[in-house]
Amino acid sequence: MTTLYLIRHGKTQANLEHRYCGSTDLPLSQEGAEELKRLCYEIPEARFLTSGMRRTEQTLSILFGPVAHTQSPAFREVDFGVFEMHTYEELKDRRDYQAWLTGDNMANIPPEGESGNQMTQRVLSALPELLKEDTVLITHGGVIAAIMESLFPEEQKNRYQWQPAPGRGYAVSGKNYRPIP
């Protein structure tokens, strides 16, 4: 049986400002880096992957030191298109933003971006490879939520309920999972 460790990157300035941030390659905030330094994860022998985004690379380095790892863009966050790096307050009066929020939010595509369903399809197409051996994946909240929602549909949680706090995540073995404190 293999174990998949899903860990969300540490906080960025965009997280602190409640900005939509998916495709923008931001570093960790100073607060995010300091919070990660207080965490201690003991993970047995495993391969390491990141999404390749700066915030995931920095999180890996802080949590596990200089370990060999692979980057996989399949595990990048959703692309929010023209809404990227804006807050709800900045966007709330835009007609295209309201259209994106209305109806099936997972199917709606932000202008010049990708839908939640498109991101999920991208992530799930790469997931079987991760399940072949013990793997630590440092990635993004939406990616982790998509994986957890697909692995545990019987939990009947929505995507936002699966999304871990920065620096946190899940360890998944077969059909057993546990939150990483």
Language-model features and meaning:
Residues 154-180:
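Domain-level recognition of soluble alpha/beta enzyme cores
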Residues 63-122:
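Phosphate-handling substructures
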Residues 12, 143-144:
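Short active-site segment of divalent metal-dependent hydrolases/proteases
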Residues 43-74, 97-99, 151-152, 173-181:
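Conserved histidine-centered catalytic loops in small-molecule metabolism enzymes
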Residues 2-67:
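Active-site-proximal alpha-helix that buttresses catalytic centers in soluble enzyme cores
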Residues 27, 67-74, 155-164:
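Short hydrophobic/aromatic-enriched beta-strand-loop microsegments
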Residues 4, 46, 133-142:
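Generic beta-sheet signal
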Residues 50-51, 121, 138-139:
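Short beta-strand scaffold positions
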